[in-house]
Amino acid sequence: MTENTEKGASVETPQVAGSQTNPPVQEPLALTKIPPIKVKSERPDAEVEAKLRAMNAKIKAEMVTLMRRSNSNELGNNDESGESESSASADDKKNIKPVKSSNEILAELFGVFNAAPPEELLDDNLFKKKKKVKKEKKDKKAKKKKTTKSDGECSDSEAEGKHKHKRKKHKHKDIRVKDKEKDRDRDKSKEKDRDRVTDKSKEKDRDRDRDRDKSKDKFTAAQAPSEKEKEKSESRKRSAVEPSSHSEKRERHEREKHRDWEREREREKEHERERVRSNNSFYNGQREADRLKGSESASTKSRQEQDLSDISLSDEESYLREKASNGRRRAHNSFYDEKEELSVSPKRNVRESNTRRNRKSRSRSRDLGIDKKRLLEIARRNAINMFKQGTMPGVANMTAEVKDKVLVKMRYGGRTIQDLTDFCKKISNGDGLSDLSSEEESDVDKNGNAKVFHHPFQLKEREPIVMHIRNSTALVPAPPRLDEQTKAITMQFPVSSGQTHRNNEVWVPVDPKDSLVPLPSLPPAKQATNMFKETPKNVFAKSIPLQEQQEPAFKPLGGAVVVPPLAATQLPTVPQSVPPTVPKEFAPPAVPFVPEVPIPSTSPVTPMQSASIFPDVTPPSMDVSSIITQRLSAIRRLQENPADSEALKMMYTAQRNMSSWANSKHLPGQFTGSTGAQVMKAHELNSGPQLWVRKDQMTSTKPVTGGMGMALLQKMGWKPGEGLGRCKTGSLQPLLLDVKLDKRGLVSRDDLRPPQMRAPAAQRRNKNMAGPIGAGPCPAVQGAGPGPLASTPLVTQDKHPVCVLNELTSKNKWMPPQYKLRQDIGPAHNRSFLFSVEINGQTFTPDRGSNNKKEAKLNAAALCLRSLGILPPS
């Protein structure tokens, strides 16, 4: 409400209120006695407000004609009453006469237009306020209750103090709280409108009676002041006499508000604790309570100590009771709390707050100290009993050592109940067994030796998957191949796929065990075959004793063949049964012998020939254990000092000795395996792209210059010079496709020929009476006349024989070629097909089959074209 300061002339004294017969005499007395004070000039009167509400309800409910009549009567009454009051009151009473408030003026202005003034304009608090401060819920409910009271029950000073009081602690409220309070205010205004509509009929009757009374009392209004003025004067007198009572009431009201705000804050904290307890475990809620205990004020602590009950429970009973209450309690939701607060009346809210306070004092405090160590021991004891009884999942598969480790960890390693719960979950899932001993963090391996390297991020080895199946025997995995087996296989098969071992054979002479007696001279063919068969003996180091017998293999063909002299000397040693004419019989074949396979010579190898691709490996002077020891010591020294030159030298020497030792154990040999080359078979070679498909078929075609294609492109909106496609980003030149999808009806430019003269009837009659096509060329080919084959030569370049044969028959107007399957033999994986083609009454059949039918038809068509002379002979 607006506050205006006025002089004491505007204040009514008891003398002025009591005697009205002689006002001019008492006016100076009042001015001298009462000092000037500050008062509230504009204050809502209860009777005026009730009248305003009645007028608004009547305006909304009555018809338009009744509204106009009532408004006219009301305006007439107001004018008459104003005139009577002005005529009856004297000049000195003008200072005492109450001025019309702004609310009354607004009500009269809106009454002319048959409308009710908005509540925002009737509220005088909005003119003086700079910031809109939200009140507490209880303040709003109390305000609503006071507005519903009868006239004169609420003092103006209390209402003014309530509006004037601003709390700075409400500045921390966020926007969501403000929105909720706006919604509540909107709902309350709707409820008020609903109440006004329900009381419409009652207020209508009251207004009619009041109008009759006004017409009767308009003559007596000039003689005596109304009761309204008396009450106004009394209230002003009380406010002037007792200015100190307002400050006391204001302070008392502020204290009550502060106390209510503390209770509301404490209630919100309890709701938050309940929400945390419902979501988290027991001890999480306990920790939260311990944190909040230190931050509360001293008054809250004393209040909580008074509220504690004398009933003492054991820690286990309290834990079970809290657990049961958490299970029964519904999860907190602020959405439902807001709806409940809107639906509850203010009286009920006040009553519930008192009962809630009393109920809270009877209940046990949530900050009650609980012996956590005792609860931890109880939980640990229960877990150990379950582990010993075997009821915990995963215990049956543990060994005795693992069980002992688990028991030790459960007895002495657990910190909280949550740790024990997590550890039991790990045991049931099989994940906790690897965490019993932290081997990856220690610097000692399983054997007790110091680790060379420490890996801080080393991954654990993946454990094998174990499936528990009843009545099943476990499959024993095959043992891995040992190093001895691998070494034996390497010694037996020393050569790999040929990448490391190259074919550089060196023949080493070997002394024969027994001197072999050479056989007599053999025929040349037999000699050649014998020498070819004896070559494996040379491979296995069984050389022929005579070196001269192998020398002719490396001489040129034109050279003279030297007869070995040893043969002549050994001829007498042959038994006499052999006829002497044997050398004469063997003399005629004097053709120089050239073996099909060159025979390696057994002559001593020169130093140039002894060059080997394998390095000469000298055996190391130390054993493997000393090499490894030297390498480990070098590694340790390098870890301490990476710039140690001696350690680097030792490392290099050990590495070189290790590689030389490994190479010495590697024995090279001849390649006896397979190169791994996958030679394709005939049917595999014939599969894939066919012969008549070219790689540049889609790129080296002719551009579109006209015809139907160009017409369609231009019809679709394409212009020469633009790119193809929707976004015009394609090729600038459209190309013709060189693929014929249909053999009939298509004519190319090469096939067009000028019109020919009609052949004579005799020639047309004898056109098809020629001899067999396969026997020789056709008459047209021989030049008998301008036949079809002679006039337009066929283009066979880059064309399939089947297509060429089809074009030939279509040009000569013959029957199309007929292909018939003549042969289909062979296994399922390697079939052999043979086709024959019939053209103009002649049949052509190739002499060999093919792996597929397309190739067989191709061979038949090619044979037909070769016989006609179109294709060159193969």
From Swiss-Prot:
GO terms for cellular component: nucleus. It comes from the Eukaryota. Residues 70-89 have a biased composition (Low complexity). Residues 176-219, 226-277 have a biased composition (Basic and acidic residues). Residues 12-24 have a biased composition (Polar residues). Signal peptide: none annotated. Residues 1-45, 68-98, 120-368 are annotated as: Disordered. It is found in: Nucleus. Residues 800-870 form the DRBM domain. Residues 705-751 form the G-patch domain. Keywords: Nucleus, RNA-binding. Expressed in ovarian nurse cells (at protein level). Residues 128-147, 162-175 have a biased composition (Basic residues). One of its GO terms (biological process) is female germ-line stem cell population maintenance. It holds the Pfam family G-patch. Disruption phenotype: Results in a progressing reduction in egg laying accompanied by a decrease in number of germline stem cells (GSCs). In the ovaries, results in an increase of Rga pre-mRNA. Results in a decrease in the levels and stability of mRNA and INE-1-containing pre-RNA. Might reduce levels of DIP1 sumoylation. RNAi-mediated knockdown in the germline results in loss of GSCs. Disulfide bonds: none annotated. One of its GO terms (molecular function) is RNA binding. RNA-binding protein that protects nascent transcripts containing intronic transposable sequences, known as INE-1, from being degraded by DIP1. Modulates DIP1 activity by repressing its sumoylation levels. This ensures that intronic sequences will be degradated only after splicing. In the ovaries, regulates germline stem cells (GSCs) self-renewal by repressing the expression of the GSC differentiation-promoting factor Rga. This is Protein Son. It comes from Drosophila melanogaster (Fruit fly).
